[in-house]
Design a protein with these regions (language model features):
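Short, compact, well-ordered microdomains
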Residues: 64-86
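Intrinsically disordered, low-complexity regulatory regions
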Residues: 2-65, 85-86
């Protein structure tokens, strides 16, 4: 376990810096949109999805369709990042 205050309880990698603890508590799926932990060449592929996730939670009412939108956005983000892995 690391002494880094940004590390998760599991110590696997740092907690998302892109969202506040309050945002993560309200919408746990947001933890999957962070990108600061990725290697620099992969961050540009992930960053726009993080920004769009932030826009979605800021502008859409919390309901089942918003959850579906975030889940599908996460699928797209994962594919975009994997497309850039050599």
């Amino acid at each position: 376990m690391t002494d880094d205050p940004k590390a998760t309880a599991s110590g696997i990698h740092p907690s998302p810096a892109e969202f506040t603890p309050e945002q993560l508590q309200a919408d746990p799926i947001l933890r999957f949109f962070h990108y600061a932990h990725l290697p620099l060449p992969l961050q540009p592929a992930s960053r726009p999805f993080c920004e769009l996730a932030r826009h979605i939670v800021a502008t859409l009412p919390r309901n089942a369709e918003r959850t579906v939108a975030l889940r599908k956005l996460l699928e797209a983000k994962d594919a975009a990042v994997r497309a850039n892995v050599p």
